[in-house]
Amino acid sequence: YQTICSRLLAKSGFYQSGGAYGFRDQLQDSYGTKFLDIGILYNQIIKHSKHQFIEGDVEHWWHDENNRGIRTKFSDDLLWLPYMVAKYIKHTGNYEILNVVTPYLNGAKLQENEKEKYEQYLPSNVEENIYEHCKRAINRACGISDKDWSFGEHGLPKIGIGDWNDGFSNIGPEGKGESVWLGFFLYEILK
């Protein structure tokens, strides 16, 4: 009840009261409702797929009222979509979610010197199924579709401007920081 009311509906936490949809937050929180109503997770997956750019990255957070959000170089956000799709399929045995078609967002890629950009992002004319959305996220995270999102000198994924541990934000904006946590997370998704 608390997760549904305070996190999914109110979009608020003790330290976050801006009312935005957080990409990773909403997906994580909706997974906690899987035994109560798996439809909540299904709906969040579909909703979040519409906040992915064609390059595979996603809005870190957004407001539905004005279609404004923030495009960032956080390294983990984009992987929450394939992770939760895999969890949904494992829990339900229903692969049909992979066939649902949704649009990507339009938006200029961040420049090398940009860490984030807040602006209005609207749906593009490019639509693909959830399976392709997941592939784009994984390819981006592995550096297949964008060399800036690759692995560092120790063979670990680059952290970008942060990973799941927000306390490590901005330790790798020059492309040198790596994330052990992200390595484990990516491995979990790929297996």
What are these regions, as identified by a protein language model?
Residues 1-191:
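Acidic, mature catalytic/reactive cores of soluble proteins
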